[in-house]
């Protein structure tokens, strides 16, 4: 069974010990409009983050390219 981008984002966030609120604050401080609702929407597969926002999240989660 394939994981969706959203499922993978949620798994990485939890594995990194980050809350949705922490990620919202981090993204907002980096110039992105990312409310907690927005992050839940990404994780539920209802929308997708921009590539730049995804890069910030990957760095916060310790995911390397």
Residue ranges: model-predicted function:
Residues 16-41:
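Short alpha-helical DNA-recognition segment
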Residues 9, 20, 36, 51-54:
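Helix-turn-helix DNA-binding elements, focusing on the entry/boundary residues of the two helices
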Residues 12, 29-30, 57-60:
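Low-complexity, intrinsically disordered/propeptide-like segments
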Residues 1-18, 26:
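A short, Lys/Arg-rich alpha-helix, primarily the initiator
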Residues 44:
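Short, conserved catalytic or interaction motifs in soluble domains
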Residues 50-65:
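DNA major-groove recognition helix of helix-turn-helix/homeodomain DNA-binding modules
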């Amino acid at each position: 069974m394939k994981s969706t981008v959203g499922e993978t984002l949620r798994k990485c966030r939890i594995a990194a010990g980050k809350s949705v609120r922490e990620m919202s604050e981090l993204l907002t401080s980096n110039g992105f409009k990312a409310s907690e609702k927005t992050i839940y929407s990404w994780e539920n597969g209802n929308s997708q983050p921009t590539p730049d926002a995804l890069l910030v999240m990957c760095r916060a989660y310790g995911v390397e390219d």
